[in-house]
């Protein structure tokens, strides 16, 4: 048995879970998420708990067991608490602002970078240098944060660019002059 896959998922109050035709739908106070479950595993919803089981010990079933359980748990946590990833912008003149459904970034290029926000994602800007990417879908929040970071990743000499708030940048020493 998968150590992660065998654990049941508690369904909190205010959350409804339905499983019809290999599509799992989780509704909660923050929204609704749907996911197609792989045919290698089966999901059962009973007594306020969700359990993920596999029919056999085939390699594909074993690899999908823990993954499916974690994905379902992420859905339950997302519709109750939501997810947030924090980013920081370092550099002279580097800033961000939200205009409608777009994030406008000034990152030292000759033009501002305009990033349309996916539906279900909100970005809060604090002091033009701190971003908070929020949403109920953990995968989409992480993917959006990674895309924003990729516009100007942190460089190792001065540390300029966009980085995760928890990330530490390994700094390099610059060139030494001729002596």
UniProtKB/Swiss-Prot annotation:
GO MF annotations, alphabetized: rRNA binding; structural constituent of ribosome
Record keywords, A-Z: Ribonucleoprotein, Ribosomal protein, RNA-binding, rRNA-binding
Organism superkingdom: Bacteria
A single GO BP: cytoplasmic translation
Cellular component terms (Gene Ontology): cytosolic large ribosomal subunit
InterPro entries on file: Ribosomal_uL6-like, Ribosomal_uL6-like_a/b-dom_sf, Ribosomal_uL6_a/b-dom, Ribosomal_uL6_bac-type, Ribosomal_uL6_CS
S-S bridge residues: none
Protein family according to the UniProt entry: Belongs to the universal ribosomal protein uL6 family.
Quaternary structure, from the entry: Part of the 50S ribosomal subunit.
Function: This protein binds to the 23S rRNA, and is important in its secondary structure. It is located near the subunit interface in the base of the L7/L12 stalk, and near the tRNA binding site of the peptidyltransferase center.
Protein name: Large ribosomal subunit protein uL6
């Amino acid at each position: 048995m998968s150590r992660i896959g065998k654990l049941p998922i508690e369904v909190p109050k205010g959350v409804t879970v339905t499983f019809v035709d290999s599509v799992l739908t989780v509704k909660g106070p923050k929204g609704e998420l749907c996911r197609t479950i792989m045919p290698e595993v089966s999901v059962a919803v009973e007594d306020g708990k969700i359990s993920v089981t596999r029919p056999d010990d085939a390699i594909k079933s074993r690899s999908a067991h823990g993954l499916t359980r974690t994905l379902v748990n992420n859905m339950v946590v997302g519709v109750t608490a939501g997810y947030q990833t924090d980013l920081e912008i370092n550099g002279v003149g580097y800033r961000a602002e939200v205009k409608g459904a777009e994030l406008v970034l000034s990152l030292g290029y000759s033009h501002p970078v305009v990033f349309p926000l996916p539906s279900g994602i909100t970005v809060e800007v604090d002091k033009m240098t701190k971003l908070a990417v929020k949403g109920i879908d953990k995968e989409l929040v992480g993917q959006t944060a990674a895309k924003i970071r990729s516009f100007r990743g942190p460089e190792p000499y001065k540390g300029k660019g966009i980085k995760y708030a928890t990330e530490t940048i390994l700094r390099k020493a610059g060139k030494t002059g001729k002596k």
